[in-house]
């Protein structure tokens, strides 16, 4: 299966690594650059740690930085995602809010483009606790049957809320090609 690339190839690489097949042998069979295979090995190693180690803050940070969802951690520990989420929050393993530097550090950038990451321990912005606002969920990436018209619905929702006096309207979206992700559409993105 490693010599036939399809949409399952990364899973086959992970299975091969779990079986103890070396990175070099997987490379010979798959022609996938060893650098990528080693990255998959790192993920497999963390999964094994999750299965066989005590779940503490350090291991949760490591897993979250590697991109593990609470559901995946729960599966490895034979617990529910809610239990993992509660434990994670109680241990203070929560993502930080970071600003995207749209000017590549050439000049100070003050933007409303934000993202969540487990790769930091402090927030780039502080939102006052007494500040109220509304979050509008965007349509996400374009796909067949869902496109510009759904994004336009997001934009019109934001504009309508602003016209009705809402000062803090944030949009959550994961498609940088959309109008709803333009910097001047909402308070925070």
Regions found by a protein language model. Give the residues of each.
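ATP-dependent carboxylate/acyl-activation modules
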Residues: 1-189
């Amino acid at each position: 299966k490693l010599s036939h690339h399809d949409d399952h190839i990364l899973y086959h690489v992970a299975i091969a690594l779990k079986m103890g097949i070396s990175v070099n042998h997987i490379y010979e069979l798959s022609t996938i650059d060893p650098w990528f295979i080693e990255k998959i090995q790192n993920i497999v190693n963390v999964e094994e740690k999750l299965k066989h180690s005590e779940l503490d803050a350090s291991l949760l940070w490591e897993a979250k930085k590697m991109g593990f969802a609470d559901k995946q951690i729960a599966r490895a520990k034979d617990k529910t995602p809610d239990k993992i989420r509660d434990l994670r929050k109680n241990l203070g393993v929560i993502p930080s809010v970071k600003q995207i530097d749209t000017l590549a550090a050439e000049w100070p950038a003050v933007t409303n483009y934000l993202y969540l990451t487990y790769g930091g321990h402090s927030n780039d912005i502080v939102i006052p606790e007494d500040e109220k606002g509304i979050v509008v969920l965007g349509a996400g990436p374009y796909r067949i049957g869902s496109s510009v018209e759904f994004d336009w619905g997001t934009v019109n929702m934001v504009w309508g809320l602003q016209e009705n006096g809402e000062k803090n309207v944030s949009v959550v979206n994961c498609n940088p090609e959309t109008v709803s992700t333009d910097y001047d559409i909402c308070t925070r993105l």
